[in-house]
Each structure stands twice: as C-alpha cells, then as structure tokens.
C-alpha cells in the first residue's frame, strides 16, 4: 500500500522565519514517522536552491532561477502574490500528485489553493493566522471550504467556530514551540554581570519587532507610570529586543517623551563578530565593545541573534510582557516561559489563550476599536493597569517570583511541544483514505466552453440574475451558487465598482490587505463577463494538462 502524499505550502524550511521554523519542525516530526511521502512548496526558495540539498523530502522552490524562462521570471515579478506559490501550484501538483495539501499562513497567502482547478483532487488542511475578530466574511468562507482547519490558539478556534456557525471542520490546535536552546539559566546575577548589567536590577523585558501593532508607546508609558509609583526606582529597567530604524515607532522620540533614556536597554549586534550586547540607546549605530569599532546596530530581521544568544537575553528578564494590540500567536511568550520567565500579555486575540496556558497574568485592555483597513477589533491597552500589575509583581518576595517562573516553564512543557503539535496533523492525515491508484487525480476533466456574450441584455434583468447566469453559463461552476463569490458578484454589479487586489484577480478582494493598498475601480457586466471567461479558460487549460499528464503516468 502506498504512503499518503503530503504537500506543505509555506516558507522555505531552511529559513529562520516563523512560518519556516514551524513548517520545518512539523515536517521533521512527520518525516520521522516514516508514514508519508512529503514535499514542500517553498516561498523565498529558488527552484534548485543549494540550501535545500540536505532536506530529506521533495523540495519545490517558488522563486524562478537561471533555469527558468524569461517569461516565467517576468510573470513572477509582475504579480506580488506569486511569492506565495500561486504561480507554480498547479505544476507542482501535477508533478507530486498530493493527497493532502496543507498551508499555515495568512488568507492572502493560501487562498490560491481554494481557487485551483485541481481543488477537487486533494484534501485541503489549513491552519490560518487568526489574530483578531471578527474575521472577514471572505476569509471565513475560504476556511469553511477547507476539508479541515487547525488553529494556532484555542481563542482562534472559538472565533472561527462562532463566525461560521460551526460549519468549519475545526479539528483543534497545533501551536508552535520554542527552540531547544531556550532553557532557564539559574545564576541570573552572574549572567547580568557578564553583560555589565546590575545583578540586582528589576527587569521587565519584551521581544517584539518595531511594528504598528506592537504597542511600544504604551509600554513606555506604562513603565514610566511604574517608575513614578515606586519609592526607589533606581534598580528598575525595561529591556526591548527590537529594531530601529524600522517602519514602526520612533524609539528615540519615545525615550525622550517619557524620560527613559537611562532606563531602557536594547540589543545591539557587533558588525564584525555578530555577537550581541545589551546597551542603553546609543542611536542606530554605536561602538562595539568586542572590537572597539563603530558600526554595531540594533537587532533586526536581517541582523538577528542565534537562539542561544536570545535565550541568554531573555534570561536577563524578571518578567516578560507581550504588549500588542493583537497577535496571531506571539511566540516570544512561549520562548520566555521556556526560560522560566513569568509572563504578562494583553488579554486579547491569541494572547488570551497563550498567557493563560502559561499561567501568566492577562492585562485587560481598556477598550477594543474597529480597524478601518480590516474591519477587525484591536486592543487599546490600559497602561495604568499594566503599571499596577508590574508593581505588584515586584512587590512579591523573590521566592514567589521564582516559583512563578518555574510554573511558567512547567506550563510550557505541558502545552507547547513540537511532538504534540505534530500529532495534531498526523491524526488528521491518518483519518484520510487514499486511493492506491491515484483515482483522486484521474477523475474526468471538467471542461466547459463559456457561453457567448449577448449583444444586448434583456430589459429589467436584475444583478442577481446576471450573477447567476455568469456563474452557471460562463464560468460553469454551479457550486459557487449561494456562496460568498456570488454575493460579492451581485454587490459589485449593483455598485458598479470593485476593490483592486494585489493578485490582479477580481474574485479575491482581501488579498489587497497583503500590502495595504485598496482602491476602487469601475465594474460592469462586460468586465464581469471577461473575468469569468478568464477563470473558465484557465480551468479548462489546466484540466486538459492534467488529463494529458495522467495518460503519461498511467498509460491509460
């Protein structure tokens, strides 16, 4: 009996991004079982990437290399969503013939699989990033169309179940874990002394990129409120492992505004040795203590630190805080807990689940506001409450604080382990019956010629009638009746305009959220007809290619 074929769509597993790390760990677990044939379709990996030579499963790089035609390179560069794999997905499918396709990314990174002409040939198991509520109707409709849906957190699962009316086939959580380098360091005083930090300091730390949703202005204000509320604040420090300059907050301006220049540590990276060192803010570039040369910069995505070094940095903290207006997960909370550091986090989005699982302290937001771009709620933090919780934490005896750190570590071991997360995927894969002869890929071709466009529409034709005719007679996909696709088509025909998209495809308006650009364009029956013809023709072409490929493989 053949093994089930699993295709994971994500970022190249030789990278150190969040998606890449998660995929690498899950695929390593699945590969270790020996039960599956595995392949990855790798964003940001080249077709014949040398970094993939030691990967023990099949590798399909998304980025065209020198072996590709100029036309393919041009197609890739012209469409921003090509980086996620949409341009090569059908070709990969015809080469690998997956039984199950998986994806763990944001909506606009994964929805191409739902729209694929081959969707009926494979099971689709997804774990989308759910970082706020409510989720857009189009997103929920897509997740509902999947054969199975996992989430990063319990909170996200509750959101999807509630919004879909329990119509999503939700099968549980499969959260990420921390790298094995994240371990408690018992002698915290010696560690601090080695970095030139007061061994008796009281340090609140965070590891967050300098982004809009990471609430550095509020965190700085909350810390200022803490300093003003204690009798002697000389030993209190905030440690921010973040980037500057970046597209986010003006760090030096915030330090000046809240008079914190001597109270906030940052991580700098020596340009010559790559070694990190903590320092008060000294600008975007400063002198390295290792070489004496100028040019050390703050940590960033491009100049990051090794897991072992970040573990040491986290072990400098007495308390870890995740101060964001939303999170799809917030992995640094788990990494801090793995180091035995107590956790506090905004009590909203995935942080609701994570902070409780880690036996930390939820920080109730003051309010939620609805974001214009996404329609999702974001948290407004209560900085006075946060300052009070910080103060209460440090008023406890050291023995109690150490006990809380031990409990955080135990909670990490209980809830966030790679083998436990891998088993969630494994359980679903093992529930699927596969065809020994790849019958799922040998189904009859679905080919329909679009109905010719009428020279003139009948009088009093409603937009509902037009939409239905376009779907049934031009597109030829009756399953889209009574779907989000139909309701959106009716809406846009009625309003006579539509939202532009990064993908250039009418039917995916939400992909514009990928880069924040949303503009409206005219829309009428003629444009709608042309779009339906395009989708229909693309489906027909790939279906003909599939049938030809099956004949080559199986000699039918």
Question: What is each residue range found by the language model?
Answer:
Residues 8, 198-214, 220-223, 238-240:
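Conserved donor-binding/catalytic core segment of Leloir-type glycosyltransferases
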Residues 47-148, 154-155, 494, 499, ...:
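Extended catalytic core of nucleotide-activated donor transferases of GT-like folds
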Residues 145-186, 265-266:
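Donor nucleotide-sugar binding/catalytic pocket of nucleotide-sugar-dependent glycosyltransferases
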Residues 182-197:
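A short helix/loop element that forms part of the nucleotide-sugar donor recognition site in Leloir-type
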Residues 248-312:
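Nucleotide-activated donor-binding/catalytic signature segment of Leloir-type glycosyltransferases, i.e.
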Residues 392, 400-415:
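A short, well-ordered alpha-helix in the C-terminal region of glycosyltransferases
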């Amino acid at each position: 009996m053949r093994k089930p074929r699993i295709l994971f769509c994500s970022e190249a597993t030789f990278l150190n991004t969040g998606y890449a790390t998660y995929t690498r760990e899950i695929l390593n677990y699945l590969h270790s079982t020996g039960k599956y044939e595995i392949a990855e379709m790798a964003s940001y990996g080249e077709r014949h990437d040398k970094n993939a030579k030691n990967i023990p499963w099949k590798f399909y790089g998304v980025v065209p290399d020198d072996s590709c035609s100029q036309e393919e390179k041009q197609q890739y560069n012209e469409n921003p969503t090509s980086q996620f794999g949409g341009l090569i997905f059908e070709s990969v499918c015809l080469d690998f013939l997956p039984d199950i396709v998986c994806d763990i990314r944001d909506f606009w990174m994964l929805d191409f699989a739902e729209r694929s002409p081959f969707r009926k040939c494979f099971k689709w198991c997804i774990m989308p990033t759910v970082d706020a509520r409510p989720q857009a109707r189009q997103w929920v409709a897509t997740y509902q169309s999947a054969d199975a849906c996992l989430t990063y957190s319990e909170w996200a699962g509750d959101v999807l179940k509630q919004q879909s009316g329990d119509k999503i086939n939700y099968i549980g959580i499969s959260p990420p874990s921390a790298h094995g380098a994240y371990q408690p360091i018992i002698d915290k005083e010696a560690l601090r002394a080695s970095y030139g930090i007061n061994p008796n300091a009281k340090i609140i730390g965070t590891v967050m990129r300098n982004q809009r949703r990471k609430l550095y202005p509020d965190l700085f204000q909350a810390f200022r409120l803490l300093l003003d509320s204690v009798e002697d604040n000389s030993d209190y420090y905030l440690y921010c492992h973040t980037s500057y300059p970046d597209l986010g907050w003006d760090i030096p301006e915030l330090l000046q505004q809240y008079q914190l220049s001597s109270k906030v540590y940052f991580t700098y990276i020596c340009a010559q040795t790559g070694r990190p060192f903590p320092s008060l803010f000294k600008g975007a570039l400063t002198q390295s203590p290792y070489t004496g040369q100028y040019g050390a910069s703050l940590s960033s995505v491009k100049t990051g630190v090794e897991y072992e070094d970040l573990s040491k940095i986290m072990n400098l903290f007495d308390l870890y805080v995740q101060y964001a207006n939303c999170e799809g997960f917030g992995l640094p909370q788990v990494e801090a807990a793995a180091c035995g550091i107590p956790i506090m986090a905004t009590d909203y989005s995935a942080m609701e689940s994570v902070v409780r699982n880690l036996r930390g302290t939820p920080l109730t937001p003051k309010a939620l506001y609805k974001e214009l771009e996404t329609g999702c709620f974001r948290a407004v933090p209560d900085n006075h409450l946060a300052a009070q919780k910080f103060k209460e934490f440090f008023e406890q005896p050291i023995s109690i604080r150490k006990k809380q750190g031990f409990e955080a570590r135990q909670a990490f071991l209980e809830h966030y382990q790679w083998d436990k997360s891998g088993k969630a995927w494994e359980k679903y894969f093992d529930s699927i019956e596969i065809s020994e002869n790849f019958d799922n890929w040998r189904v009859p071709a679905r080919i329909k010629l679009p109905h010719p466009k009428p020279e003139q529409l009948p009088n009093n034709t409603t937009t509902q009638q037009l939409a239905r005719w376009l779907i049934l007679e031009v597109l030829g996909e009756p399953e889209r009746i009574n779907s989000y696709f139909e309701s959106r088509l009716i809406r846009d025909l009625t309003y006579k305009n539509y939202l532009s998209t990064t993908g250039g495809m009418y039917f995916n308006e939400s992909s514009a959220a990928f880069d924040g650009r949303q503009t409206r364009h005219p829309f009428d029956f003629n444009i709608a007809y042309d779009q339906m013809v395009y989708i229909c023709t693309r489906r027909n072409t790939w279906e003909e290619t599939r049938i030809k490929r099956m004949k080559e493989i199986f000699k039918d």
